[in-house]
Amino acid sequence: RTDRMGRDERNDLLARIRGQTVLMPNMRPIFEKYIGELNPNYQALIPVVNRKLESLEPNQKRLAKLKKADFALFASNWWPHADFDQLRIVTYLAIWLFLWDDVLDEPTGEYADNFEAAQLYRKETVQFLADTLGLSISKEISTVVTYSFSDHVKVLARQLKSSLEYVLALHPSENDYMKRGGFVAGLKTLGKQLESAVRWGLRLRPTKKSPPTASHPIIEGFRVIGEELKTAYTVEQRQNFFEDLKFYISTTEMEQRFHLDGKLPTLKEYWEVRMGTSAVAACLAMIEFTNKIKGPYQSTNHPLLKTLSDEANIIVVIANDMLSLKKEIVQGCLDSLIPLSVPVYGGVQQAIDQAHTDLLAAVDRFDAEAEKLLSGPNTTGLSDRELRIFVNGCRDCWVGNFNWSLCTGRYGLGVIDQKSGSFHLPL
């Protein structure tokens, strides 16, 4: 009965929205006061992205749709200062986040209507992320196995001592072997043992085999990202990134429950979920990577930086949910900001106007927080230069997301006249 009531509520709301034409307010002044640059590697990245998509999506119709979204443009807007190699990896991350989520929440998604299968998909993903990032999961807490430098020195010393004793026939048990094998054989053995000792001391000893191929190609697609970050990031940075990804994955569970139960979430419930499903935090955690910053940093989860990260997240979500409204209504998706605001504010236009007001307020809060961070004492652990890069990187992301949203074929706004800033949008 509850399920039927929820579906009736959804159908009524969809009928209330469809067929209307609304005025999307001019958001350009909010974003254009900041320079929205485009990464100069954009054109070179397009064929790389197309090859990546072709390797992940066998369905030609869906492949064409994905190419139309222009992920190269997305990444080039979000990370305008990244070198090509770094830009390629963050673009792969953007693709991975979009595709991983589509399996669960698109109407045609593989596990959209199968919660049990979706849970297995989530569980395997979390484990695969940890493995590829060089982290191990234990009792829901991620740790990494490391050895101190002194441990390596002790092991190296023991192996060198053993090797020298062996070749010089100082070890009683090995005298007979030396006599039988001769001095050359002893030298060969010494060489092998020295190689082993040095490899251990330099942490070049054989490592565990990389995680086996994931059961789903989308999950497997994260491997190249994780392997890159194992070199580029410290344990702390990888842990921070992993926490943001885990939050993203966990909130998709709540989102799917709403969908399957037929229940429309309240605005409060929506925001609790959307702060994770937006995946903005995980993208902001790559600012250090795109700027080649390596250190024991938390960035997006640091108590002093989380407010800034959260405001950037809110800005991206509001602007995204406004500009993707047409796409969502065409697909019959109501779990986004504007549709859920309609019953609260009395209509679609009123919901859009309120979102615009909230967007302006979020930008003001972001600017105030950025000013506070950059003008006050720096106790974030980042250097002053690194802190400024992170703050500016957060701004690049929400400015870039707006510019991409107006151009991407994913939202279907390209054919609409946007020159005046505001535009009419038929739903």
Q: What are these model-derived regions, one by one?
A:
Residues 1-427:
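Alpha-helical, largely C-terminal catalytic domains
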